[in-house]
């Protein structure tokens, strides 16, 4: 199994530090609003990575934090005349509603920054004691010039970073690239006691503290959105490696950017979509499938037209499941014919192709193509006369591989009940006996409209669902 490591810019053989255990940290949301589709892409992709690792037999310790104190949360609390805690609690709850709808599994731990203030203070003390941080007027800053590898993740040297840094001029800093580990209290803002006076933690330190607390000083995988490479992940590396003198993470994974109608998503352009507003109109699994139909590192363009295409694609998969479930109910248990044994071999090959796609840097786009091939082959070769063993084997495999992608087809329902189909077939047979060809054709057409194809054979009428 190989994955692309942002740090080395190459695909590497995946070998976790401990056999069959993966310690994985994903940067979670700042909880001041509903999550948007850019957030959702990251959470869906890394949930899928986790699911595939579990499918392969790994135990995955999956930690995803909540940033529950931040300027955006403070501003929203002021706007609504409420507390930061109330805003954070509300949007953590809303996050879980969206995540559950999208089939995103709960993390092993969902730590919150405000519950780790003591740990953060202890971590900052280590950095001060080792000479990597300095205190000015109740603020504590990390001194980037002291960390010789600063810029190694974004592949930039300090001079390049300085030239491109859009940093507020802060007279307190020794260097514009230095960043706050602890921020002195401002009037009206929440604050905690510390050796440097009342204040609150900086954003970057929170992730270093929470990831290492729950997963150890070196992680297997650290993952997030492309906008986090610099400065957030770069700063996490600097803090963590300065504190512990060992690599912070073995592998770094980042998704590609998501644009809307070929433009960067922004509220001012009116092309901003939250997960909530889309899942009110579309099955959440359609949005999930859309996100996985492109390779996770590729940029992705979002539009409602493209989402409609994903909806049609999802319906093809969903209808295959409906058809397979129906056949599992009506077929008889008997030994497999030679043709059916060949089909088993063919589906085992599909499973291998699916795994090969996922083993190659989690290529969900190719894996989904395999599911479509499976659906097509099942629809073309299975009927009410197939062996129950064969149908159940294919159904179980299809659902298991779909589950790796987080697709359960839970809303897939049979559009027409089996009893109704059999009743109409009987009616048609009666019409044929009476040579009432017009009525017989009308019944056939009526069933076809509802996704049922009839086939007249010497053994009798066979039927199957096509959607």
Swiss-Prot record:
Q: Which InterPro entries match?
A: Cys-tRNA-ligase (IPR015803), Cys-tRNA-synt_Ia_DALR (IPR015273), Cys-tRNA/MSH_ligase (IPR024909), CysS_C (IPR056411), Rossmann-like_a/b/a_fold (IPR014729), tRNA-synt_1_cat_dom (IPR032678), tRNAsynth_Ia_anticodon-bd (IPR009080)
Q: Which GO terms describe its molecular function?
A: ATP binding; cysteine-tRNA ligase activity; zinc ion binding
Q: What GO biological process terms does the UniProt entry carry, in alphabetical order?
A: cysteinyl-tRNA aminoacylation
Annotated binding of ATP, by residue: 267
Pfam families per the UniProt record, alphabetical = CysS_C, DALR_2, tRNA-synt_1e
The cellular location(s) given in this protein's UniProt record come to: Cytoplasm
Which of the seven top EC classes does this enzyme belong to?
A: ligase
Q: Domain of life here?
A: Bacteria
Cofactor: how bound: Binds 1 zinc ion per subunit.
Which SMART domains does this UniProt record tie to the protein?
A: DALR_2 (SM00840)
Q: What's its EC?
A: 6.1.1.16
Q: Which CDD domains does this entry report, sorted A to Z?
A: CysRS_core
Give the matching PANTHER family.
CYSTEINE--TRNA LIGASE, CYTOPLASMIC, CYSTEINYL-TRNA SYNTHETASE
Q: What is this protein called?
A: Cysteine--tRNA ligase
